Curated annotation (Swiss-Prot):
A motif (LXCXE motif, interaction with host RB1) lies at residues 107-111. Residues 69-97, 175-232 are annotated as: Disordered. One of its GO terms (cellular component) is host cell nucleus. The keyword Metal-binding applies. Residues 40-48 are annotated as: Interaction with RB1 in competition with E2F1. The keyword Endoplasmic reticulum does not apply. Keywords: Activator, Early protein, G1/S host cell cycle checkpoint dysregulation by virus, Host nucleus, Host-virus interaction, Inhibition of host innate immune response by virus, Inhibition of host interferon signaling pathway by virus, Inhibition of host STAT1 by virus, Interferon antiviral system evasion, Metal-binding, Modulation of host cell cycle by virus, Transcription, Transcription regulation, Viral immunoevasion, Zinc, Zinc-finger. This is Early E1A protein.
Length: 232
């Protein structure tokens, strides 16, 4: 392999200057003015040419806008209304300082208030019960001591008032069959079909009973539910 050795130039400075002149870019040749009055526009940067011809639609729109403003100004001048003036506020009617006069007829209540008796039953002043009570003779006819019940019986109604009905329910004796049912005791065993029903009998003496009553000893230890065989 052969190697060629380029002889070094005699003057290195002159050689570098020659290389710089050969490699000098084109942008260095353009002239730049440092004292420009205004920054460049987009048209200058992108080389966009403006159209010098005037569009006819622009003039038409301008003329229409001027005509509208002239017509609106003439109508406002005729009506005497200025656009900057605010509409007047409607006056608030003054309220009278003295209180309103209320007649006595307006304060009267035309409805009749109901009255309440001892049983808290609402009745008016002209009910049929009061008319019947005024003309009723308590010494004539079967009376159970209650005017309400007598009033219902006079009208051929087999009914009682609420208070007498509750008293009759409270005084009704209990049936004998219900007492016998209460005395029955039902024994239930663990075996299926081992349900036995018997009537409770008074306690028999210890000598007559087949099995003497032995008191159950008191449990002092906790109940063991495990499956382990218990020690003997």
């Amino acid at each position: 392999m052969k190697y060629t050795i380029v002889p070094a130039p005699r003057n290195l400075h002159d050689y570098v200057l020659e290389l710089l002149e050969e490699w000098q870019p084109d942008c260095l040749d353009c002239e730049y003015s440092h004292g420009s009055p205004s920054p460049p526009t987009l048209h200058d940067l992108f080389d966009v040419e403006l159209e010098t011809s005037h569009s006819p639609f622009v003039g038409l729109c301008d003329s229409c806008a001027e005509a509208d403003t002239d017509s609106s100004a003439s109508t406002e001048a005729d009506s005497g209304f200025s656009p900057l003036s605010t509409p007047p506020v409607s006056p608030i009617p003054p309220h009278p300082t003295s209180p309103a006069s209320i007649s006595d007829d307006m304060l009267l209540c035309l409805e009749e208030m109901p009255t309440f008796d001892d049983e808290d039953e609402v009745r008016s002043a002209a009910t049929t019960f009061e008319r019947w009570e005024n003309t009723f003779d308590p010494h004539v006819g079967p009376i159970f001591g209650c005017l309400r019940c007598a009033f219902y019986q006079e009208q051929d109604d087999n009914a009682l008032c609420g208070l007498c009905y509750l008293k009759a329910l409270a005084e009704e004796p209990a049936s004998a069959g219900a007492e016998e049912e209460d005395d029955e005791v039902i024994f239930v065993s663990a075996k299926p079909g081992g349900r036995k029903r018997s009537a409770a009998t008074p306690c028999e003496p210890d000598g007559v009973s087949k099995r003497p009553c032995v008191p159950e000893p008191e449990q002092t230890e906790p109940l063991d539910l495990s499956l382990k065989p218990r020690p003997n």
